[in-house]
Design a protein with these regions (language model features):
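Conserved alpha-helix/loop element of class I SAM-dependent methyltransferases that forms part
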Residues: 28-47
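A conserved beta-strand element that flanks and buttresses the S-adenosyl-L-methionine
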Residues: 110
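N-terminal, positively charged/glycine-rich alpha-helical extensions of SAM-dependent methyltransferases
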Residues: 1-21
Length: 180
């Protein structure tokens, strides 16, 4: 499991380089060739919305010409390498999604496939921060909570230590932030 390598140092460098290719392969299989991330952000781009992608990792969920932030320099290095080819206007910053404050509000804030990799307190802090940054919407995309019925294999859990807790608690956490 590449997640067992961590996100920093030599293990993080290896993880980041594997993540870009393996994520594309896995997504191609899981979503039948659809680019699910692009399907989510494209309508916002079509309407000229500014987008901040929190916990962007290797940049696969960061729209062209927009901003991605992550706490792993190794992940950002890979993101910059691949987006330099596709879109030079995409910006990546080494920042913590719990604390990052841009100089101005951003129309749409996204966080894709990251919540299952962090503890509950981080979910809450990121949601609170994203709601302060976003002018219009905060979009979270991650593993569906009913995935727990499939009994994730031990090898997955070794690299994803927060997965079971995420699956068991994310609905309650999100409910606390539901619009009234």
């Amino acid at each position: 499991n590449m997640h067992s390598l961590g996100n920093i140092g030599i293990g993080g460098k290896l993880h980041a380089n594997l993540a870009y290719t393996s994520t594309k392969i896995i997504d191609n299989i899981r979503y039948n060739g659809r680019n699910i991330r692009k399907e989510i952000y494209q309508p916002y781009l079509d309407n000229n919305k500014s987008i901040l992608d929190m916990c962007c990792g290797v940049g696969l969920s960061t729209p062209p010409g927009q901003i991605g932030i992550d706490t792993s320099q190794e992940m950002l290095n890979v993101a910059k390498k691949y987006t330099k080819i596709a879109n030079k206007n995409t910006k990546f910053y080494l920042e913590n999604a719990e604390k990052f404050r841009p100089s101005k509000k951003i129309d749409i804030v996204t966080c894709m496939f990251a919540f299952h990799e962090m503890p509950n307190y981080a979910h809450i802090r990121i949601i609170q921060n994203a709601l302060m940054i976003a002018k219009e919407e905060f979009v979270i995309v991650d593993i569906a909570p009913n995935y727990k019925n499939k009994n994730p294999p031990e090898i997955m859990l070794k690299g994803e230590p927060y997965l079971i807790n995420y699956l068991n608690t994310i609905n309650d956490i999100l409910y606390d932030f539901e619009e009234t």
